[in-house]
């Protein structure tokens, strides 16, 4: 399945190249492309592979921060790096590599799950028994020049499975708690499991978030004020071609399958699922 997905993405990439060539032939500039990468855990044994991915990123795109309001230049290639769940191995294994290359990143924090072994659904392959999320002290010491923090709710709740008042509490209180922890404004929010709807978007706007992130692998930041931003799932274990295609936006065809999976999760998730 992974190889099949990569081959479809390669076809998308080739089609993009043909389209851009035709635009140049007719005197038009290529469209800007930006992708937001969604990482989770970066284990020590994966640091070298992560570093190689960051080398590819700076060669193929210009890094941007998740809070940017920059208008993308026609023909430009851009990438944003994010990490969900605030695993502490990011500190030792990801931040040094990001700092070397001057790549900004956003870490999405689950405010009531700090300093503990993850007990929610494990998406990644790098978690070990002693894996923990960052503590409040570790969050406060993250270099603000390089790292911004966003909310990922209090409990990693699937918000679409909660009643709206409970979901509102997860969204609003996580922002308030995180701001109190680090004494900095929290402007971004990331939906656990990528599950959201229009009502939740309204709650996020009312709570004061300036941008929210999903797991739909679409091209991002087409407008400076874009509120709902998609991301593509990446992992240090990705094959090089696989990562290059994700970086080029080749996986955006996966938007429909991702939405289908989210719909099925909503159908089968128990009420008040965590």
Regions found by a protein language model. Name each.
Residues 1-82, 87-93, 161-274:
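C-terminal active-site subregion of NodB/CE4 polysaccharide deacetylases
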């Amino acid at each position: 399945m992974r190889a099949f997905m990569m081959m479809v993405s390669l076809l998308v990439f080739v089609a993009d190249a043909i389209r851009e060539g035709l635009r140049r032939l007719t005197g038009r500039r290529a469209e800007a492309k930006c992708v937001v990468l969604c990482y989770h855990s970066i284990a020590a044994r994966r640091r070298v592979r992560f570093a190689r991915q960051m080398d590819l990123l700076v060669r193929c795109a210009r890094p941007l921060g998740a809070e940017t309001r920059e208008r993308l230049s026609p023909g430009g290639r851009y990438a944003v790096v994010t990490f969900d769940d605030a695993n502490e191995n990011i500190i030792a294994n990801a931040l040094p590599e990001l700092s070397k290359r001057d790549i900004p990143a956003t870490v999405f924090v689950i405010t009531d799950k700090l300093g503990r072994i993850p007990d929610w659904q494990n998406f990644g392959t790098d978690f070990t028994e002693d894996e923990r999320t960052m503590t409040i002290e570790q969050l406060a010491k993250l270099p603000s020049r390089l790292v911004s923090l966003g909310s990922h709710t209090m409990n990693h709740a699937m918000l679409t499975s909660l009643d709206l008042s409970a979901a509102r509490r997860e969204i609003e209180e996580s922002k308030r708690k995180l701001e109190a922890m680090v004494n900095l404004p929290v402007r971004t929010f990331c939906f656990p499991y990528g599950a959201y709807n229009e009502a939740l978007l309204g709650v996020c706007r009312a709570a004061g978030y300036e941008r929210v992130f999903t797991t739909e692998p679409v091209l991002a930041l087409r407008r400076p004020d874009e509120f709902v931003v998609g991301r593509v799932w990446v992992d240090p274990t990705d094959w090089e071609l696989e990562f290059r295609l994700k970086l080029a936006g080749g996986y955006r065809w996966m938007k429909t399958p991702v939405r289908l999976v989210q719909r099925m999760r909503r159908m089968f998730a128990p009420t008040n699922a965590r």
